[in-house]
Amino acid sequence: MIATDPAFANCRLMVATPIYEGAQGTYVRAALDLALRAQAIGLPVRFEFILYQPSITRARNMLTAMFLASDCTHLLFVDADIDFSPDDVFSLIEVMEARPECAVLGGAYPRRMINWRNVARAVEMGLAKDDPADLARYSGDFALHFL
């Protein structure tokens, strides 16, 4: 990925994050990494935050209004407890540029809980007998809602 990459030529990214109880270190590290990497390739990025709004829906609506009132072309919602890679963000932008029908993209990430039933199944199947730390791969639980 270089500064002249056509996927980024007309892109102005807004990263929108509702923050209620503070941002996790992994989010802060990822956001700083994204800001630095975007600057290096000439991609304008703007970060917007809504602080201490107890309604996540209201916070996201407020951030959406900020996006619509801005000159940004791409909106990325990232919660303040999520780790992400700038490369994944750049890949999403490239896909959206290459495929205009992909105007809205999303990424799934696990809920903040351990799915003990999956962990127990993994133990029963012997999936982590060589390295018990591998059980972490089976602990996630996802909730996806499609409209």
List each language-model region with its residue ranges.
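N-proximal low-complexity "stem/linker" segments adjacent to membrane-targeting elements
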Residues: M1-P54
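Conserved donor sugar-nucleotide recognition element shared by glycan-biosynthetic enzymes
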Residues: I56-R60
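Active-site nucleotide-sugar/metal-binding loop of Leloir-type enzymes
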Residues: N61-H74
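Residue-level marker for beta-strand->alpha-helix junctions and adjacent short loops that shape enzyme
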Residues: Y20-G22, I82, P110-R112
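Conserved catalytic core of nucleotide-sugar-dependent glycosyltransferases
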Residues: S85-L147
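Alpha-helical elements of Rossmann-like donor-binding domains used by nucleotide-donor carbohydrate transfer enzymes
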Residues: A30-D33, M62, S91
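Short beta-strand-to-loop acidic/aromatic patch adjacent to the donor-nucleotide binding site
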Residues: C72-D83
